[in-house]
From Swiss-Prot:
GO terms for cellular component: cytosolic large ribosomal subunit. Forms part of the ribosomal stalk which helps the ribosome interact with GTP-bound translation factors. Is thus essential for accurate translation. SUPFAM superfamilies: ClpS-like (SSF54736), Ribosomal protein L7/12, oligomerisation (N-terminal) domain (SSF48300). One of its GO terms (biological process) is translation. InterPro entries: Ribosomal_bL12, Ribosomal_bL12_C, Ribosomal_bL12_C/ClpS-like, Ribosomal_bL12_oligo, Ribosomal_bL12_oligo_N_sf. The keyword GTP-binding does not apply. It comes from Campylobacter curvus (strain 525.92). This is Large ribosomal subunit protein bL12. NCBIfam families: L12 (TIGR00855). Belongs to the bacterial ribosomal protein bL12 family.
Length: 125
């Protein structure tokens, strides 16, 4: 009578952890393989992340410094974000602060230009 896959699985399921570990080591030695996860898949993910960074379509508008003209910057922040006076003032004084998240490149560039004209230092991330 031939041994079936079910027989092998039943036998393996009855092994202790130590016996199973030894069996895996014997498989590795006999067939020249490794039970370690393949790292190639991880490299492909990292490569995909690099491509995504090059083709970034959403940006975060970060106010780095308000500069000397804090009142002008607060006015622009209020106009861009719709925040109230106190919230805009807190955002300007609590730099670095994220003013907008997930905005398009065009919107981010326009907002950056407005803030820089008001005297602020801005980064797009």
């Amino acid at each position: 009578m031939a041994i079936t896959k079910e027989d092998v699985l039943e036998f393996i399921s009855n092994l202790s952890v130590l016996e199973l570990s030894e069996l895996v080591k014997e498989f590795e030695e006999k067939f020249g393989v490794s039970a370690a996860p393949v790292m190639v898949a991880g490299g492909a993910v990292a490569g995909g992340a690099a491509e995504a960074a090059e083709e970034k379509t959403e940006f975060n508008l970060v106010l780095v410094d308000s500069g000397d003209k804090k009142i002008n910057v607060i006015k622009v922040v209020r106009a861009l974000t719709g925040l109230g006076l106190k919230e805009a003032k807190d955002a300007v004084e609590g730099t670095p602060s994220v003013l907008k998240e997930g905005i398009s490149k065009d919107e981010a560039e326009a907002a950056k230009k407005e803030l820089e004209e008001a005297g602020a230092k801005v980064e797009l991330k």
